[in-house]
Amino acid sequence: MKKLLPLFAAIPLVLIAAAPLRETQPLTTKQEVELREEICSNFFVPQPLPPVDMKTYRTFVPAPGVKAEAFSYVTQAGMRVPAILYLPDPLPATKIPAFVVVNGHAGDKYSWYSYYTGILFARGGAAVLTYDQIGEGERNINRKSATREHDTIGGGSVIARHLAGLMICDAMQAVSCLCQRPEVDANRIAMGGYSMGSFVVSLTGAVDTRVHACVLCGGGDLDGPGGYWDKSKPMCQGLPYQSLDFLGDRPAVIYALHAARGPTLAFNGLGDTVVAIPTHGEDFFKDMQTRTAELHGSTNGVFDYGFAGTDCGHRPYWLTRPVVEWLQRQIAFSNWTEDKIKAMPQIKISDWTATHPAIFVKSFMKPLTEGGTLALDVNVPGYTHDELNMMTTEQWDHEKTNYILETWLARVQNPE
């Protein structure tokens, strides 16, 4: 067991590796390939992926030491995704790692944690790609955030599988964009998912072998039939997760595919009632590790897990010291060392938002949840919503049909 630095002095944080393996029949490489193909087919993820066709709209400077590009790329059903790429300025002399932010419900590239990640990690010497989830931001018909529009879609399992596939494809195509960037080391790409995003990354990390490391926060606790994830938001989580029943032990298969791909960390607060962590604690994760190792044929590569204390809830923990230290060991931030990370100051996000303009959902900014996040502090400046627009109003009015949920829904319901 490895001890990590505490988020709060009285609360130890731990990260636990897998226990010794019991004898079992592991998946073969051929079976792993077939399972990835079956999962992609189940969610209508195009195989092969389409060309990303990146289109840059503008470049800007969001903070000292950081430059940014606002661009779009192609995803499922010919739709486009608005995105921002944050880069260190100046660029390091050698290629840099990269991190993809996959948002939770109500999240998009405007969300405080997307922006904060962009500035923090870019200053650490990494590229950071953030994007709008379907129905949010510049993928919303009214260009609004925190709408949860995708939850309002009617229909059953087929549309839900299409929706989950869209979210998976969005994330995979973000990786495709990063692989094409000359400044990015394609072997050092990580992906972080928060809340609903943790579900998306759990699936994406199972099927996309280009991703080196995955971080799951506010989730990753995939459970069995009739559990939290089967009963959660039906269109983006519940029905899609139920549709994977053909896998058998869904968590073990998904995480065995992760283990074959690369490192994964699930990190949660023990007080996170949003995704049932109080009943999915250490015993739950240990058992899931054991089952995963049996399918993988080794404890090597099996996911790590860690916890903050019982007064720590639903938060994007990749901004906190223990998870950044884990990421440093996986992708090696170009401007940081582990010693530098250990010495960095921290700031409670509720204090940061009290003194800096930022975009957040007020009901999430509570001490137990996002407001209590103890993020590494590199003097991240505030920002306004429009500073993170990809397009001008005139451009968006002209091009919005390529982005919005209504167009996507029409295309998947009435394919040509």
Locate each region found by the language model:
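Primarily recognizes the serine-hydrolase "nucleophile elbow" in alpha/beta-hydrolase
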Residues: Q173-G248
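Loop/turn elements at helix/coil->beta-strand transitions in domains of secreted/extracellular proteins
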Residues: K95-A98, G124-A127, A186-R188, T209-A213, ...
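Cap/lid segment of the alpha/beta-hydrolase catalytic domain
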Residues: T94-K95, V100-C169, G226-Y228
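Glycine-rich His-Gly loop
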Residues: T75-A77, V101-A106, G269
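Bacterial Sec-dependent signal peptides at the C-terminal "C-region" and cleavage site
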Residues: A9-Q25
